[in-house]
Amino acid sequence: TGSYNTFVGTSAGKGGTTSAPFSSGGNNTAVGYQALTAFTVGDHTTAIGYQAGKAQVDGYDNTYIGARSGQANAVGDGNVTLGDRALYSDTSGHRTIAIGKDALHFFSGSGTTDFQSDITKIIAIGYFAGYNMGSVPGGSWPQATRSTNNIVIGYYAGNTHYAGGSNVVIGTEALNGVPNYTQGSVYIGESSGQNVSSGSYNVAIGAYTGRYATGSYNTFVGYKAGTGGTTSAPFSSGTSNTAVGYEALTGFTTGYGNTAVG
């Protein structure tokens, strides 16, 4: 019953309130089968693609472009998604950008795993970027730590980052290898921090930097700097190390407080 809506496609903008006063949202655009089909009072949302924004009830200022993008987001606002199944499982996240196929796919879920459904202020760009971000295996993770204020850019970048905020991850398969929790870290470069499981407040810049380093407070700059000498779990757990230069400190395992330059 709202005004200034444009709906094109079977069940597009159908409305989730099936009795009076029906669905009163306005200024919405939905194009595609079941796009924005459940809306009630939401407004200023654009959903283009098969089941795009399908579950949105009263969110606003969202843009969903791509088949099933933002499909489960019921009450979130200020989200931008572009790509097949981008932001697919999120139910209430807001002010998030997901660009690329399956970017930020698992923001929430069900089954034997405990998932966080309120993930905010994330930018994920790339194929499968941040795919598992926000899905937290029960019992073994800091449940109170939200996946907020993260930036992940690149093919499979941050794909296995489950929890923790204020991270910057840029590069093909950076921070992607084992389920991980990290906070306040920067990983830039191909496979940088690829197997980090729990380290926080690290800086790793350069291809393969900190690839097998799971400790905290490390700084690695340069090709393969601080890669880590233990290449299988539990990997290299040394902390508070600084390595600058080509393959500097590349073989460290449990070292603490080392500085290697050159």
Model-derived regions, located:
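Glycine- and small/polar-enriched repetitive beta-structure motifs of secreted/surface proteins
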Residues: 1-262
